[in-house]
């Protein structure tokens, strides 16, 4: 028996697969889920979501969202989700640099500071997952 992992973004269902384990970046720290885990729900930070299938790890960059565990099913409702091999590193690097430059021009009191900070975290997660 295995866990069912579903990753969904506003645009599409990204993945539906049977897995042995899921590790995700929660807002209160990283955590793992295995078979028969207690039900819970948490918010996700931008970062690396890893699942293990048949002893092999697979990595996704998620741009925040929510994760729910119930009845051996893990549902990820992510703002964005990209498999490591699908990440355009040049585009991610440019997005990171652009967001970082915009953030440096803002103070924490600026209305757009929080949004730019989130853009930096999402782009950094994509670069990390892509291995760059």
Curated annotation (Swiss-Prot):
Gene transcribed to yield this protein: atpC
Subcellular location: Cell inner membrane
Gene Ontology cellular component annotations, sorted alphabetically: plasma membrane; proton-transporting ATP synthase complex
NCBIfam families from the UniProt entry: ATP_synt_epsi, PRK13446.1
Similarity comment: family membership: Belongs to the ATPase epsilon chain family.
Organism: Anaeromyxobacter sp. (strain K)
Function summary: Produces ATP from ADP in the presence of a proton gradient across the membrane.
Lineage: Bacteria, Pseudomonadati, Myxococcota, Myxococcia, Myxococcales
PANTHER family: ATP SYNTHASE DELTA/EPSILON CHAIN (PTHR13822), ATP SYNTHASE EPSILON CHAIN, CHLOROPLASTIC (PTHR13822:SF10)
Self-association and partners: F-type ATPases have 2 components, CF(1) - the catalytic core - and CF(0) - the membrane proton channel. CF(1) has five subunits: alpha(3), beta(3), gamma(1), delta(1), epsilon(1). CF(0) has three main subunits: a, b and c.
SUPFAM superfamilies: Epsilon subunit of F1F0-ATP synthase N-terminal domain
An annotated Gene Ontology molecular function: ATP binding
Principal location class: membrane
Gene3D superfamilies: F0F1 ATP synthase delta/epsilon subunit, N-terminal
Keywords of this entry: ATP synthesis, Cell inner membrane, Cell membrane, CF(1), Hydrogen ion transport, Ion transport, Membrane, Transport
Protein name in the entry: ATP synthase epsilon chain
Transmembrane segments: none
UniProt membrane topology term: Peripheral membrane protein
